[in-house]
Amino acid sequence: MTRIVHDGDGDTRILATDVRVADSFFARARGLMFRRSFPDGSALVFPFGRPASRTLHMVGVPFDIDAVWLRGGRVEQVSRLSAWTGLGRAVADTVIELPAGAADGVREGDTVRVDDG
């Protein structure tokens, strides 16, 4: 079972257990667009392989999300993106999208990892 794990301030917390990986061009381009919901415990992971400026937009996404930009497993930025109009950008090699509120308590410099079990 793949899960998203947050290590910060001496605590370890599971952020998601229903994890999907956007590992193709089409999956990365679609992201969460046109989905009707994003249940608690879900995550969408965008692995890019190397750090670069990564932009997320919320066009076609009808719900708020939390986005976590990672570089080498360290949190570079955490943002709450608003439905339809949200926009976020940071340098990262991995970006994780979570339901709004799931990344509460995640801070820059913390560790977040995709754990295969």
Q: What are these language model-derived features?
A:
Residues 1-117:
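Compact, glycine-rich, soluble single-domain proteins
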